[in-house]
C-alpha cells in the first residue's frame, strides 16, 4: 500500500486500537511512502546510534535523550521546531518504536498536527537470541539507509 491517504486511514485505525494520543502508527514501508509524499522523517535516536548503527538519508535528527547519560533532551521541542514546520506531517523513528512513541506524543501536545510513530523502528524487535535487525524494522525491510 503506497497511497498516502490509505496509509493515513490505516495509521489512524491503529491509533484508535492502540489508544495512541497522536495521528497514528505506521510500518517502516508505510513511513517511507509517506516520506515520498512529503512527510518529514525525524530520527530521535542518540548521536552514537546514528553514527554507529546507520542513518536514513534525508532525515532530520533530533535526539530524544543523550548518550551515555540517557538524559532527556531539554531542547527537544525547540530543535524539532527548527527542523520541521508544525503543518508538515512527521514520522518519528528510533531503534524499536519506544522513544519515537513518546516523541510523537510530545510533539502532538506541542501543536504538530500530524505525527506518526514508526512501528518496529530502525533495528526492529529482538529475536529469540535477543538480537535486533533479524525480525523486522527499517533496515530489514530493505529501505534506504547508510552507515555512519
Question: In which residue ranges do the predicted regions lie?
Answer:
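Structural scaffold elements adjacent to functional motifs in cytosolic proteins
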Residues: 41-43
Amino acid at each position: 500500500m503506497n497511497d498516502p491517504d490509505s496509509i493515513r486511514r490505516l495509521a489512524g485505525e491503529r491509533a484508535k486500537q492502540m489508544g495512541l494520543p497522536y495521528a497514528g502508527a505506521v510500518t517502516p514501508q508505510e513511513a517511507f511512502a509517506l516520506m515520498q509524499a512529503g512527510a518529514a522523517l525525524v530520527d530521535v535516536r542518540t548521536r552514537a546510534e546514528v553514527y554507529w548503527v546507520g542513518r536514513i538519508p534525508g532525515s532530520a535528527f533530533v535526539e530524544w535523550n543523550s548518550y551515555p547519560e540517557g538524559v532527556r533532551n531539554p531542547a527537544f521541542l525547540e530543535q524539532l521546531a527548527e527542523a520541521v514546520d508544525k503543518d508538515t506531517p512527521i514520522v518519528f523513528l528510533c531503534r524499536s518504536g519506544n522513544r519515537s512513541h513518546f516523541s510523537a506524543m510530545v510533539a502532538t501536545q506541542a501543536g504538530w498536527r500530524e505525527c506518526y510513530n514508526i512501528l518496529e523502528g530502525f533495528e526492529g524487535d529482538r529475536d529469540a537470541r535477543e538480537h535486533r535487525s533479524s525480525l523486522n524494522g527499517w533496515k530489514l525491510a530493505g529501505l534506504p539507509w547508510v552507515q555512519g
